[in-house]
């Protein structure tokens, strides 16, 4: 083992060495990226750095060229706190305390120098600039197949991104404090997050048509006494998928690294070896052969021995059940100490004290597991190299994947829960599966004579019971014109017809047809009723048959199927066939249940509810923006009430009930610096208003519901279902006025808890122009509406200056300016 402290391997500008927060090595082992307080990302060559681990006589002659980084990127405006290469080495994701996530992509080809500036050997471009976090980004992790990217930060959020398009898929606000670490399962089933709320949450995700996420388990026991003074909680998942190592845990008064077992999520094992809280834990990406020379009584997980007999027996059981492989993990933190552990030992392989002068921030292994990169707040990048076999005998990388087969790494368990028995049954079923016979798309859709296509109509009654003809294969002779008379055939009505010649054999004479007995029928029809033959099959001996029958509706139906409506009219009724009668009855039921033709797709219920609210009748609508957080307020500076609305899903999926129950809308109320209201709604809030007179909040949802909450969180009235989307809410004295997208007014008296007006249509005063042709054009909009102070009647002001009052006694709108005739509703 060698420890390299290279003086030029830093983030230095002038005389200052900036703190380094993150380091990561690409999966091909060629590049290492670092980021720090200077806001720059530097990419180094791993091979050039490891050259200095060899004797000095073997160093290259011009070693100064090796001391320069391959690239310097400075697009962040703050400190770079997280870096991760994608598993396919195509992208580099970087996060900063400027709340921005950048996706970098290496530009191929030579880089042109600019003026007299030093030229980088590599040039990386920013492909995407992603803005979604409200605070510092603390950690980044890619899925093993690069399909998903997850970022966490100090805003308590977990954001899932698409790994190819980099669109935001989901946002979780399930932690109650800063989220400081995230890691993916190498079997591509879970990802785990660590937070300052002293919990580790394990998320399970399914890859189907849409990604779905569920919280599998929440671990709290090892972190109940963990301090909140660490910069990071960078956890790691073992390459065999069995364990998660989480730093900054405690075992009584001792600072430890918790080891979480997969499946039952047991936390009885912990690594005791640090005097102060740990910041990072990182597993070696390689697995090693199990060493039988170690003491058999030591626990496999490389932890402190538990005094209970149950823990000892579980450790021995894991030793027997394991596939005889060991994994190696490195841990470091605020005590400036690096400890390297093996799952076959209870004590560390080695401990390097005072390796740095300040806290260690990040650790990264090379892909072959022979080198370790370590960063710290003193601005150093320390490299530790190991000789071959020093950590153990590494097994081939192919066997790493075999260790993950027990968890279904090459399968997508979409329906059934993960279990070993299920995977064993799948392997047995695969052995008995019939081999797949490759066929072209045309042949598989057309069928054969023995297996007619399902689109071919079957007659209900067969007059002639003729055996199926089998045409032997024959080589087609050279194309030449047929000599002699054409084939003549006599059909059932006595008329003579010219038999067509088979196109596939050119102008050759028709092949001799050989009849086979019924026993030679395809075995697929053995258990079914004998199929009825078409009358054309009766001429099999006289007319040449095509090898592949064409469908009745044409060749184009092979590409895009056509559903026949009322298909029973093509059949002849057969009293003797009960099965056919049942089929016809089913088809008639399907025909009756078909939906009628819709003339206006905009008025269908699905379209009305899924579209955005219609705002064309309002000059100033009150729909809140489709953002992650929306702030509403009422009152003055001395008595200010604030409501924070966090919709759990976006408007595009606002009617996905499953997504809403998993991520409900969160309502938070604040007054004088204290939280006074906290509620969860399984609906998307689209409008909100606060009433100072009644000290309450009115919330309208996309499903046509109205919630009225008091300032202290109580629901004043049960949920009010209007059935229309409310696009503007107004609080006037102790009244709440709602205006819907269908131009209807609703008025409630909150103090008296009663409905004042309902379904008052404003269309009679909106539509003043005569309709032309079949289209009605509305040239005015509603500018404002309120209640009259003296009569408590509804007043509506238009954009053209006109105003109208709703007369409750008359049941109509009246003009407030002139003495015109009342406009009836």
From Swiss-Prot:
Residues 574-591 have a biased composition (Acidic residues). GO terms for molecular function: DNA binding; identical protein binding; nucleosome binding; transcription corepressor activity. InterPro entries: CAF1B_HIR1_beta-prop, HIR1-like, HIRA-like_C, HIRA_B_motif, Intein_N, WD40/YVTN_repeat-like_dom_sf, WD40_repeat_dom_sf, WD40_rpt. WD repeats lie at residues 15-54, 75-114, 132-171, 174-213, 227-270, 309-351, 355-396. GO terms for biological process: chromatin remodeling; intein-mediated protein splicing; negative regulation of chromatin organization; negative regulation of transcription by RNA polymerase II; negative regulation of transcription by RNA polymerase III; nucleosome assembly; transcription elongation by RNA polymerase II. The keyword Repeat applies. Keywords: Chromatin regulator, Nucleus, Repeat, Repressor, Transcription, Transcription regulation, WD repeat. It is found in: Nucleus. Residues 294-304 have a biased composition (Basic and acidic residues). The keyword Repeat applies. It comes from the Eukaryota. Residues 294-320, 574-595 are annotated as: Disordered. PANTHER family: MEMBER OF THE HIR1 FAMILY OF WD-REPEAT PROTEINS, PROTEIN HIRA. Belongs to the WD repeat HIR1 family. This is Protein HIR1. It comes from Eremothecium gossypii (strain ATCC 10895 / CBS 109.51 / FGSC 9923 / NRRL Y-1056).
């Amino acid at each position: 083992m060698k420890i390299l402290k290279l003086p030029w391997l830093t983030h230095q500008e002038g005389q200052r060495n900036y703190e380094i927060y993150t380091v990561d090595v690409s999966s091909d082992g060629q590049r290492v990226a670092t980021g720090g307080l200077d806001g720059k990302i530097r990419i180094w060559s791993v091979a050039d750095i490891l050259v200095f681990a060899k004797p000095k006589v073997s160093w290259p002659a011009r070693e100064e060229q090796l001391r320069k980084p391959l690239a310097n990127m400075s697009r962040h405006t703050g400190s770079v706190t997280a870096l991760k290469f994608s598993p396919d080495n195509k992208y580099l994701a970087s996060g900063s305390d400027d709340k921005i996530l950048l996706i970098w992509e290496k530009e191929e080809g030579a880089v042109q120098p600019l003026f007299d500036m030093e030229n980088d050997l590599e040039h990386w471009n920013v492909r995407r600039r992603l803005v979604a976090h409200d605070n510092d980004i603390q950690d980044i992790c890619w899925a093993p197949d690069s399909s998903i990217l997850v970022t966490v930060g100090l805003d308590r959020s977990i954001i899932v991104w698409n790994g190819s398009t980099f669109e935001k898929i989901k946002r979780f606000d399930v932690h109650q404090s800063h989220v400081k670490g995230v890691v993916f399962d190498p079997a591509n089933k879970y990802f785990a997050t660590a937070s300052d709320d002293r919990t580790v949450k394990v998320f399970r995700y399914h890859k189907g048509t849409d990604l779905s996420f569920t919280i599998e388990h929440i671990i709290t026991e090892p972190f109940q006494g963990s301090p909140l003074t660490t910069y990071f909680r960078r956890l790691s998942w073992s390459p065999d998928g069995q364990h998660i190592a989480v730093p900054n845990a405690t075992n009584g008064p001792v600072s430890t690294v918790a080891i979480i077992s997969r499946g039952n999520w047991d936390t009885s094992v912990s690594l005791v070896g640090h005097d102060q809280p740990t910041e990072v834990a990182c597993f070696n990406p390689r697995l090693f052969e199990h060493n039988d020379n170690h003491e058999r009584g030591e626990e496999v997980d490389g932890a402190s021995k538990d005094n209970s007999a149950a823990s000892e027996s579980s450790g021995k059981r894991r030793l027997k059940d394991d596939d005889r492989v060991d994994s190696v993990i490195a841990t470091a933190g605020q005590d400036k100490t690096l400890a390297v552990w093996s799952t076959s030992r209870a004590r560390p392989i080695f401990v390097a004290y005072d390796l740095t002068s300040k806290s260690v921030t990040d650790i990264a292994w090379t892909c072959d597991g022979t080198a370790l990169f370590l960063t710290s707040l003193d601005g150093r990048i320390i490299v530790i190299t190991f000789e071959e076999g020093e950590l153990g005998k590494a097994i081939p990388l192919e066997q790493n994947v075999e260790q993950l087969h027990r968890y279904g790494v090459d399968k997508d368990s979409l329906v059934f829960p993960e279990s070993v028995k299920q995977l064993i049954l799948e392997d047995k079923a695969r052995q008995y599966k019939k081999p797949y016979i490759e066929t072209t798309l045309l042949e598989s859709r057309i069928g054969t004579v023995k297996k007619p296509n399902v689109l071919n109509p079957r007659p209900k009654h067969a007059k002639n019971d003729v055996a199926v003809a089998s045409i032997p294969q024959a080589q087609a002779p050279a194309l030449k014109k047929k000599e002699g008379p054409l084939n003549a055939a006599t059909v059932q009505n006595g008329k003579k017809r010219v038999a067509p010649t088979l196109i596939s054999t050119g102008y050759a004479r028709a092949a001799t047809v050989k009849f086979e007995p019924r026993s030679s029928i395809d075995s697929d029809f053995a258990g079914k009723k004998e199929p009825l033959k078409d009358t054309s099959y009766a001429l099999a001996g006289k007319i040449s048959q095509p090898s592949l029958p064409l469908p009745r509706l044409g060749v184009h139906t092979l590409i895009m199927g056509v559903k026949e409506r009322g298909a029973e009219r093509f059949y002849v009724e057969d009293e003797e066939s009960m099965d056919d009668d049942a089929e016809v009855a089913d088809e008639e039921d399907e025909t009756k249940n078909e939906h009628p033709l819709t003339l206006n797709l905009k008025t269908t219920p699905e379209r009305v509810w899924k579209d955005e609210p219609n705002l064309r009748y309002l000059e100033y609508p009150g729909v809140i923006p489709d953002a992650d957080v929306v702030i509403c307020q009422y009152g003055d500076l001395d008595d200010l009430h604030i409501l924070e609305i966090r919709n759990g899903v976006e408007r595009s999926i606002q009617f996905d009930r499953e997504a809403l129950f998993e991520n409900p809308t969160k309502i938070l109320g604040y007054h004088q610096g204290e939280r006074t209201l906290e509620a969860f709604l399984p609906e998307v809030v689209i409008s909100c208003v606060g009433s100072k007179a009644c000290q309450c909040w009115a919330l309208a949802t996309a499903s046509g519901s109205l919630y009225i909450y008091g300032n202290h969180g109580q629901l004043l009235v049960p949920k009010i279902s209007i059935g229309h989307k409310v696009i503007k809410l107004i609080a006037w004295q102790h009244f709440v006025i709602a205006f819907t997208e269908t131009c209807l007014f609703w008025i409630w008296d909150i103090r008296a808890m009663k409905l004042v007006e309902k379904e008052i249509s404003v269309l009679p005063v909106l539509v003043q122009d005569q309709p032309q042709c079949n289209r009605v054009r509305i040239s005015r909009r509603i500018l404002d509406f309120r209640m009259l102070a003296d009569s408590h009647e509804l007043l509506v002001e238009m954009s053209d200056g006109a105003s109208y009052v709703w007369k409750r006694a008359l049941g109509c709108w009246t003009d407030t300016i002139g003495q015109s005739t009342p406009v009836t509703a």
